[in-house]
């Protein structure tokens, strides 16, 4: 939703869309982020619960990058970079590339990795785009390399 508000401002020029993107991003960064930077998935009764899945990080990073593009406020770019680093730490598959859906803290028989789109784009597709956007904005080739490695598993399916 954050990305949609930022894009709506780009297309329609109404400042209320930029403000909506800011408010949503700020709410998540303030209320749904742990001290170590990890995200929560839900907010209910003024309480954050349930650790975020990879797709939550991917969409958040995309929203932060889009909010940075329309506001030029460095805090959103910095938050996007921090969340991308956190997502890599929690979900990255070092052996095959791409991101797992869950972090490694749960005792699962199999850690799933979804590279195919369904009703919404896959987390890996969204993350690849967000990483390429980070590369475009910062010029840091590491983001481009990470995006390439993110797409590696889809070439095998």
Language-model segments: what does each one mean?
Residues 2-157:
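Glycan-recognition and catalytic cores of secretory/periplasmic carbohydrate-active enzymes
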């Amino acid at each position: 939703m954050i990305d949609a508000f930022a894009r709506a401002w780009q297309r329609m020029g109404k400042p209320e869309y930029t403000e909506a993107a800011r408010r949503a991003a700020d709410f998540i960064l303030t209320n749904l982020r742990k001290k170590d930077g990890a995200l929560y998935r839900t907010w209910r009764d003024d309480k954050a619960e349930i650790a975020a899945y990879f797709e939550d990080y991917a969409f958040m990073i995309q929203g932060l990058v889009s909010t940075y593009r329309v506001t030029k406020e460095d805090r959103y770019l910095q938050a996007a970079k921090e969340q991308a680093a956190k997502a890599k730490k929690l979900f990255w598959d070092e052996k095959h590339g791409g991101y797992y859906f869950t972090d490694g803290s749960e005792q699962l028989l199999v850690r799933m990795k979804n590279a195919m789109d369904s009703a919404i784009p896959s987390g890996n597709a969204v993350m690849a785009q967000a990483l390429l956007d980070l590369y475009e904005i910062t010029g840091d080739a590491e983001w481009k390399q990470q995006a390439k490695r993110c797409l590696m598993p889809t070439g095998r399916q």
